[in-house]
């Protein structure tokens, strides 16, 4: 995934979840749309180097999207729309391996309802298997350990529980985390942030739901899927924000 018209700037402040003010290389303060409603406190620090996509001449309230932040010489993409695009492309081109799928994917559809939830991807294989994939972006990291979530998520908890039900009805089920940064050796659930979500993941894995993590090679203007990363619920994550 490549971004066009990328400009480097420096983060000033984020008055709400959707808006941030940044200082560009011309010395101008610009208003930007933050493409991620998560907290991102460990990333969006005053003076942090950020990547902005310039989108001029539109009816938007801002002419820029804030898509990436540099932390300790590593770029973190924070575009919340990106993981789904990377996921479907990676699944279809074989970069992402989904365990237990025994033949080629012959049909897929996005945003499919099951029960009271809408899952990101629905798949059917040539041998008749049916699968749901729920995709989550991951941007929280400390000491090369990635964690989800960076804020409590009722929707995420609901998805995990619905996937358990789908698996019990015969679907192959997957939770796919796209870590929007490169340098991590393990991923986990942030139990301190949301204990009930960690419990739900334990039940889900015991029920047969597969949890998969892929990291990405990230620059200020490009994001490329890289490789599978181990997921372990027993890994202790130290939140840099707490």
Swiss-Prot record:
InterPro entries: SfsA, SfsA_C, SfsA_N. GO terms for molecular function: DNA binding. Belongs to the SfsA family. This is Sugar fermentation stimulation protein homolog.
């Amino acid at each position: 995934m490549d971004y066009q018209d990328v400009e480097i700037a420096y983060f000033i402040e984020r008055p709400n979840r959707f808006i941030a003010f940044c200082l560009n290389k011309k010395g101008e303060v610009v208003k930007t749309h933050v493409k991620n409603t998560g907290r991102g406190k460990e990333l969006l620090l005053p003076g942090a180097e950020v990547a902005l996509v310039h989108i001029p001449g539109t009816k938007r309230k801002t002419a820029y999207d804030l898509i990436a932040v540099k932390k300790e010489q590593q770029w973190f993409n924070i575009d919340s729309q990106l993981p789904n695009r990377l996921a479907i492309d990676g699944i279809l081109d074989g970069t992402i391996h989904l365990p237990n799928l025994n033949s080629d994917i012959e049909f897929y559809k996005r945003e499919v309802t099951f029960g009271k939830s809408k899952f990101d991807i629905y798949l059917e294989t040539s041998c008749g298997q049916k699968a749901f994939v729920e995709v989550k972006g991951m941007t929280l990291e400390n000491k090369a350990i990635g964690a989800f979530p960076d804020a409590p998520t009722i929707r995420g908890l609901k998805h995990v529980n619905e996937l358990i039900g789908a698996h019990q009805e015969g679907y192959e089920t997957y939770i796919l985390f796209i870590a929007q940064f490169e340098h991590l050796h393990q991923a986990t659930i942030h139990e301190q942030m949301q204990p009930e979500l960690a419990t739900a993941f334990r039940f889900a894995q015991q029920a047969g739901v597969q949890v998969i993590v892929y990291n990405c090679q990230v620059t200020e203007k490009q994001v490329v899927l890289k490789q599978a990363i181990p997921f372990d619920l027993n890994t202790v994550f130290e939140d840099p924000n707490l």
